[in-house]
C-alpha cells in the first residue's frame, strides 16, 4: 500500500529576497564569511560568490581581526550554517556582556 501524501519540502528560511545581495554567514565552529548570495535550497545549502572569510585572532578565537581571506565561489553546507544575515541595513554592536 502506497501513500499518496507527499508533503512539499519548503525551506526553513526564505532567502529569496537576498538573492544577488551580500550576506554574512556564520558556521558552527566559529568561522564567518561574507559574499553575494547566488542560490540556496530547502536544506539551507548556500552558494556564495566573491566570498571573503574573516580571520580570527590566534590567541582569542572570539575576536575577529581586520584580516580577510578571499575564497571566491563557495558552497556552504546547510548543516553547518548557524546564522545568515544581510550586510546591508545592519550594523554591529558591542557585546553587552
UniProtKB/Swiss-Prot annotation:
It comes from the Eukaryota. It holds the Pfam family LSM. GO terms for molecular function: RNA binding. One of its GO terms (biological process) is nuclear-transcribed mRNA catabolic process. CDD domains: LSm7. Plays a role in pre-mRNA splicing as component of the U4/U6-U5 tri-snRNP complex that is involved in spliceosome assembly, and as component of the precatalytic spliceosome (spliceosome B complex). The heptameric LSM2-8 complex binds specifically to the 3'-terminal U-tract of U6 snRNA. Component of the precatalytic spliceosome (spliceosome B complex). Component of the U4/U6-U5 tri-snRNP complex, a building block of the precatalytic spliceosome (spliceosome B complex). LSM2, LSM3, LSM4, LSM5, LSM6, LSM7 and LSM8 form a heptameric, ring-shaped subcomplex (the LSM2-8 complex) that is part of the U4/U6-U5 tri-snRNP complex and the precatalytic spliceosome. This is Probable U6 snRNA-associated Sm-like protein LSm7. It comes from Dictyostelium discoideum.
Amino acid at each position: 500500500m502506497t501513500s499518496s501524501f507527499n508533503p512539499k519540502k519548503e525551506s526553513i528560511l526564505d532567502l529569496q529576497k537576498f538573492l544577488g545581495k551580500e550576506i554574512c554567514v556564520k558556521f558552527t565552529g566559529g568561522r564567518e564569511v561574507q559574499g553575494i548570495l547566488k542560490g540556496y535550497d530547502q536544506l539551507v545549502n548556500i552558494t556564495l560568490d566573491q566570498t571573503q572569510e574573516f580571520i580570527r585572532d590566534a590567541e582569542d578565537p572570539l575576536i575577529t581581526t581586520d584580516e580577510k581571506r578571499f575564497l571566491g565561489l563557495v558552497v556552504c553546507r546547510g548543516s553547518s550554517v548557524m546564522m545568515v544575515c544581510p550586510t546591508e541595513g545592519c550594523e554591529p554592536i558591542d557585546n553587552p556582556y
